[in-house]
Swiss-Prot record:
Residues 422-446 are annotated as: Disordered. Interacts (via extracellular region) with CUBN/cubilin. This gives rise to a huge complex containing one AMN chain and three CUBN chains. It is found in: Apical cell membrane; Cell membrane; Endosome membrane; Membrane, Coated pit. Residues 67-87 are annotated as: Interaction with CUBN. Its main location: membrane. This is Protein amnionless. Residues 1-19 form the signal peptide. Membrane-bound component of the endocytic receptor formed by AMN and CUBN. Required for normal CUBN glycosylation and trafficking to the cell surface. The complex formed by AMN and CUBN is required for efficient absorption of vitamin B12. Required for normal CUBN-mediated protein transport in the kidney. The keyword Ribosomal protein does not apply. GO terms for biological process: protein localization; protein transport; receptor-mediated endocytosis. It comes from the Eukaryota.
């Protein structure tokens, strides 16, 4: 096979592999200002202190002179050509001052699960990754800086970190046995620590529609590391009804388009189409395209996250509708069977293509409106019924009150028959209430007192 044939074979293998690269960013280099308490490299004549109980590997690229230096108990200094340490009097550098000693910060502060410490090797302008996919996925190639020192914490150890390959100190590990032997060596112990484990395999993603990242089980650790500077809490979103895509730690403003695809769908081709034909028309938007698991159930779908980063909101919703229209027109050619979309603050409209588009949002809205109208009609019917019965009740009560007259007493007081010796008028006998008079049949309503019969009886 000639050189051209070998080149074509290599290109075909790369196309089939579809491996992504994740690059480790922070270092423990001596000249890195971020590694020092004063956020600068120690000046000449300063007092330098390394953590006594920490193991660390430090690359030194220049010559330095200090008045005093406290070294770690377990560590190494990798000196570049012409680099070294020497003694220098305190105050030799007038800009240094006689302040506190320069402290080398804790080298164990860097965690494998911190998304801020990784950079994607194939990132394009306008594209981003959800938080869980910023950490190496199981099909990624991991590259550590070959000419810099570093130290990585592998986590609590409940779940091993699994990637396709690890490149460190000029070596590429694709087998667990070789990687385990390196991690057990002194060079490995100085660069990797913690109870966690690191594994390689099973290989690159061979599915043109993409592969699930596989970091869902460790997402709580990823979010904890990401939100540690914020006290473990997400900042409030700048929009109502913010969205939280699969793999994201906090809510965001924008839209999410979910694609159900067929066997001919190619995620790289769709990502390139989005980047070339749509994103340039919507400045202030970033997109993330990846395969995720559809909840509930074991099935997968392609998630397109449109995040608004500009000052003018609403662009994500317009782009989501444009993507739905694109699926309605070109869905069969793209290998997309159906698409749905939702937007922060309001549902996104859709059209019909080779499958139901946006049926979830529209059906939910229609169901809510129908339920509200039904409740309103029931309330109106009950109110009308009460209004029609209330006057009849009041009129019936009034008729009952009028139909029961209050009868005046029929008796009278006769002063001729009053008892002798009484002065003044004889008090009237108290009359029983009307209800008792009406209900009594043995008591006469017309009577008077006869004193003659009263004396005879006496």
């Amino acid at each position: 096979m000639g050189a051209l044939g070998r080149a074509l074979l290599w290109l075909q293998l790369c196309a089939l592999a579809r491996a992504a690269y994740k690059l480790w960013v922070p270092t423990t280099d001596f000249e890195a200002a971020a590694n020092w308490s004063q956020n600068r490299t120690p000046c000449a004549g300063a007092v330098v202190q390394f953590p006594a109980d920490k193991a660390v590997s430090v690359v030194v690229r220049a010559s330095h002179g200090f008045s005093d230096m406290l070294l770690p108990r377990d560590g190494e200094f990798v000196l570049a050509s012409g680099a070294g340490f020497g003694a220098a009097d305190a105050g030799r550098d007038p800009d240094c001052g006689a302040g506190a000693p320069a402290l080398f910060l804790d080298p164990d502060r860097f965690s494998w699960h911190d998304p801020r410490l990784w950079r994607s090797g194939d990132a394009a302008r306008g594209l981003f990754s959800v938080d869980a996919e910023r950490v190496p996925c199981r099909h990624d190639d991991v590259v550590f800086p070959p000419d810099a020192s570093f130290r990585v914490g592998l986590g609590p150890g409940a779940r091993p970190a699994r990637v396709r390959s690890v490149q460190v100190l000029g070596q590429t590990f694709t087998r667990d046995e070789d990687l385990a032997a390196f991690l057990a060596s002194r060079a490995g112990r100085l660069r990797f620590h913690g109870p966690g484990a690191l594994r390689v395999g099973p290989g690159a993603c061979a599915d043109p529609s993409g592969c699930v990242c596989g970091d869902a089980e460790v997402q709580p650790w990823i979010c904890a590391a990401l939100l540690q500077p914020l006290g473990g809490r997400c900042p409030p979103a700048a929009c109502p009804d913010a969205l939280r895509p699969e793999g994201q730690c906090c809510d965001l403003c924008g839209a999410i388009v979910s694609l159900t695809h067929g066997p001919t769908f190619d995620i790289e081709r769709y990502r390139a189409r989005l980047l070339r034909a749509f994103l340039p028309q919507y400045p202030g938007l970033q997109a993330a395209v990846s395969k995720v698991r559809r909840r509930p159930g074991p099935h997968t779908e392609v998630q397109v996250v449109l995040a608004e980063t500009g000052p003018q909101p609403g662009g994500a919703g317009r782009l989501a509708r444009a993507l739905l229209a694109d699926v309605a027109e070109h869905g069969e050619a793209l290998g997309v069977l159906s698409a749905t979309a939702r937007e922060s603050g309001a549902p996104v409209g859709d059209g019909s293509a080779a499958g139901p588009l946006g049926s979830g949002s529209r059906a939910g809205l229609a169901g809510g409106v129908a339920a509200g109208l039904l409740l309103l009609l029931l309330a109106l019917a009950a109110g009308l019924l009460l209004l029609r019965r209330a006057p009849r009740l009041r009129w019936t009560k009034r008729e009952r009150l009028v139909a029961t007259p209050v009868e005046a007493p029929l008796g009278f007081s006769n002063p001729v028959f009053d008892v002798a010796g009484s002065v003044g008028p004889v008090p009237r006998t108290p009359q029983p209430p009307p209800a008792q008079q009406a209900g009594s049949s043995s008591t006469s309503r017309s009577y008077f007192v006869n004193p003659l019969f009263a004396e005879a009886e006496a």
